[in-house]
C-alpha cells in the first residue's frame, strides 16, 4: 500500500518553513515592507519579490517610451513586450528592463509621483498578477505589495498587514529619498505619502485593503530587529499550527481556512495585547 507521506511533501528545514511557503506582506508606502520581506526571505530561505518594483519599472518604461500614464492598453502592451526581471542582489534587488539595470532609476521622485496612476489600471494589474503567481510555481516566496493577500495569493500561508503612523513613514521615506534628492523635505514626502495612500486605497482595481485573515502589525515604535524577532516567531507559530497531518492539498479548503482563521484570530489578540491596545 502506498504510504500517504510518500506523496510530494515539500522539504522542511529544521526550525524553518516548508520550501513552498507563501508569505504575503501588504501595507502602505513607507511601512517597512521591503526591509521585513527581505529579512524573512533570508531567514526562511524563500524568494523575495518586491511587486512595487514591478509597477515602478513599468512607469520608468512608460517615461522612456513616451507612453501616457492614462493609456492602459499601451502600458499593458509595453509590459507584454518587455523582459522584466528581478534578481536578488547583495543588499537589495536588481531590477532589469530588457537587460538594462534600472534599480536606482525606479526610486526617483519622478517615478514616485506617477507610479500610483500606472498601477491603477485593470489590464496592467492582470498581467502583473499573472507574472507574480507564475514566480511562485517553482518556489516559496515572501511577496510584498498592496494586493498580495487579497488578490495575488488569497490562500497564502501567512498574511501580514504592516502599518506605521504617517509621520513615521514620512521620516523613513525621506531618509531614503534625500540620498538622491537633497531638496526633498519631510513635509513634502508626508504630503506625497498621504496622496499615494489615498490613490492606493480608493482606486477601483485591487485597492490596498486589510484582508480579514491578515495579521495586523504596527511597527511605529519597534526597531527593525525587534520587529524581525516578533514576526519570525509569529510566522513559525502560524505555520506550525496550520501544518497538516496530511499534505495540505488533501485537506478541504474550508478546513484550511478555519485553522488559519483560528491561528490569526489568536495572533491579532496577542498583538493588540503586546501593543497595549
Ligand atoms: O511599494 P512601492 O512604494 O514600491 O509601490 C509603488 C506603487 O505601486 C504604489 O503606489 C502602489 C503600487 N503597487 C500596487 O498597486 N500593487 C502592488 N502589489 C505593489 C505596488
Sequence positions of predicted segments:
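Small-molecule kinase domains that catalyze NTP-dependent phosphoryl transfer to phosphate-bearing small molecules
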Residues: 10, 87, 132-139, 146-151, ...
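P-loop (Walker A) phosphate-binding loop of NTP-binding proteins
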Residues: 28
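Extreme N-terminal, non-catalytic leader segments
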Residues: 1-22
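Hydrophobic anchor at the beta1->P-loop junction of P-loop NTPases
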Residues: 25
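N-terminal phosphate/diphosphate-binding loop that engages ATP/GTP or pyrophosphate donors
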Residues: 43-107
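ATP-dependent NMP and nucleoside kinases share a basic, alpha-helical "lid"
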Residues: 103-180
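Conserved lysine of the Walker
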Residues: 33
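Hydrophobic positions on the alpha1 helix immediately C-terminal to the Walker A/P-loop
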Residues: 36
Amino acid at each position: 500500500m502506498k504510504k500517504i507521506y510518500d506523496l510530494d511533501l515539500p522539504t522542511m528545514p529544521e526550525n524553518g518553513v516548508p520550501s513552498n511557503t507563501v508569505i504575503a506582506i501588504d501595507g502602505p508606502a513607507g511601512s517597512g515592507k521591503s526591509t521585513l520581506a527581505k529579512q524573512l526571505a533570508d531567514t526562511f530561505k524563500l524568494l523575495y519579490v518586491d511587486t512595487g518594483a514591478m509597477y515602478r519599472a513599468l512607469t520608468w518604461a512608460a517615461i522612456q517610451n513616451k507612453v501616457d500614464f492614462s493609456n492602459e492598453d499601451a502600458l499593458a502592451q509595453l509590459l507584454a513586450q518587455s523582459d522584466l526581471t528581478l534578481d536578488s542582489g547583495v543588499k537589495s534587488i536588481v531590477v532589469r528592463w530588457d537587460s538594462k539595470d534600472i534599480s536606482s532609476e525606479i526610486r526617483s521622485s519622478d517615478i514616485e509621483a506617477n507610479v500610483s496612476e500606472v498601477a491603477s489600471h485593470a489590464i496592467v494589474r492582470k498581467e502583473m498578477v499573472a507574472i507574480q503567481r507564475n514566480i511562485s510555481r517553482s518556489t516559496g516566496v515572501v511577496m510584498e505589495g498592496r494586493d498580495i493577500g487579497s488578490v495575488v495569493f488569497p490562500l497564502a500561508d501567512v498574511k501580514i498587514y504592516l502599518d506605521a503612523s504617517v509621520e513615521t513613514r514620512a521620516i523613513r521615506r525621506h531618509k531614503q529619498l534625500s540620498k538622491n534628492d537633497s531638496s526633498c523635505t519631510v513635509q513634502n514626502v508626508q504630503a506625497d505619502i498621504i496622496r499615494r495612500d489615498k490613490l492606493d486605497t480608493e482606486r477601483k482595481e485591487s485597492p490596498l485593503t486589510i484582508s480579514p485573515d491578515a495579521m495586523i502589525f504596527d511597527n511605529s515604535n519597534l526597531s527593525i530587529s525587534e520587529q524581525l524577532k516578533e514576526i519570525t516567531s509569529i510566522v513559525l507559530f502560524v505555520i506550525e499550527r496550520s501544518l497538516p497531518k496530511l499534505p495540505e492539498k488533501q485537506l478541504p479548503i474550508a478546513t484550511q481556512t478555519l485553522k488559519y482563521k483560528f491561528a490569526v484570530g489568536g495572533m491579532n489578540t496577542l498583538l493588540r495585547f503586546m501593543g497595549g491596545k
